[in-house]
Amino acid sequence: MFRKIISLLLPLLLPLAAAGQYRSEVWCPDNGNGTYSNPVLNADYSDPDAVAVGEDYYLTASSFSCIPGLPILHSRDLVNWEIVGHALKEQLPREVFGSPQHGKGVWAPAIRFHEGEFYIYWGDPDRGVFVVKATDPAGEWTAPVCVLEGKGIIDTCPLWDDDGKCYLINAWAGSRAGFNSVLTIRELSPDGLRAIGSPRIVYDGGQTNHTTEGPKLYKRDGWYWIFCPAGGVQRGWQLALRSRSIFGPYEARTVLFQGSTPVNGPHQGAWVHTAFGEDWFLHFNDRGAYGRVVFLQPMEWKGDGWPVIGKAGKGETCGEPYLKFRKPQSASAAVVNPAESDEFDGGTLGLQWQWQANCDELWGMPTAGGCMRLYTADLPEDFRSLWQAGNLLLQKLPAQDFTATAKLRFSSKEDDQWGGIIMMGMNYSALTVRRRGDVFLLQRLDCKGADTGGVQTETTLASLQPTERDTIPYSPAIHLDIYLRMKVSGGTCRFFYSTDGRHFREAGSDFTLRQGKWIGAKMGFVSERPSSSKGNRGWIDADWFRVTR
């Protein structure tokens, strides 16, 4: 009787359980009819890796120098994903990553589950191999442990063998090591926390598969398998390598390529074997300024013992990507997407937000009034562009076409304090308000080649009267309530502003998006003041940030 009651109530309870889960207005891969459309993650989760634990799936991705780092996403069906946490609160050494270190830090992590614990390994190309652990992937992770010091070691992945021994595979960054396209394996201590063996080259793709990197190490039916990309980010392909010995030699086969599809460079990712006996492969697709989005492909083991990924005809040994396919078998019907909008009502930042460097509490904090306060941070004395500013609060772009609107109050104590919204990358553009005397100047701030020393320029668009003025005798502020908006379509961003939230005016010319260093363009907030400032800081109170069509 009890089971019958539960079975009757379950369809009613499931929507309630999912009520707190985020649904995107701009991209949802679940088609609602048992199929999905790629990408399953339409945002910059580059170099993805995933692990299955029972009927749950956990994914992480490269975070480079963005903080918090190592995002943790959860899914019940490999299609519907949500952000549940981060494994890295700050980058070490803290003082080095206290300022932006674009393109450095966490490269191509691997997530694994071993004896009741989750492990994430990654290579920092300037420092070595690191690992963090957790029993709950959505909870607290340990502080990073350095498994191996070294230069150029990237794209690391462990394997615990049947005899309890632990091995680590890695690729090499040519920019640091002076060579690439080589994969090496070495033995770790059984707990996986330190290297005890010397590296051996197990594969050199230099002549036939250039830019071999991003390896993931598995074992199946007595075979050791290396899944790795080759050919480069934009135009590469996916390899599978196998050997009866962990140290090789390995034979290689291409198992996924672009083929006749528009999906360039379908490679680097994770083989996932589900509790329902199915095999799937998650990989990225480079979309320039939008970053590297994540696709899901079916994977099949053929009679000759080799896998084929994606769509392949009879007798073909290499597949090409599906744009649409049936969903993996799952007991879950929940539709959920990674968070984008934020009302700032919960007392903590949404998990979609990251800083450009290790966070300083002086940069900002949530308020009891349901806002995110962002204080004007001191720009460096040698300021050229916001490429140097760690306090940018940013998130990934959620789709190719979307609108992002922020409602905020800017409060200024002194001249030349400024803040607003920004579309950030190696070229960037921001729509800001700056105090000048007793008024605010609406300005577009633009920079080309920020990564190579480009200098920010300012264009004043309008003069705006304050919404409110303090009457206190000590350090009075003037305040401006304003709505700022970005509309993105086809790689172009247009800016708008409004003082009432209903009537928006265009603010300046169109801006062409450009990616950051190894990451896609990002959007969010900026709040700054000159390095010479000595008085009280100004601030943004961001009431909300909403992503819509």
Language model regions located:
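Carbohydrate-active catalytic/glycan-binding domains of CAZyme proteins
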Residues: 20-549
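Bacterial N-terminal signal peptides
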Residues: 7-15
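Positively charged n-region of N-terminal signal peptides that target proteins for export
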Residues: 1-4
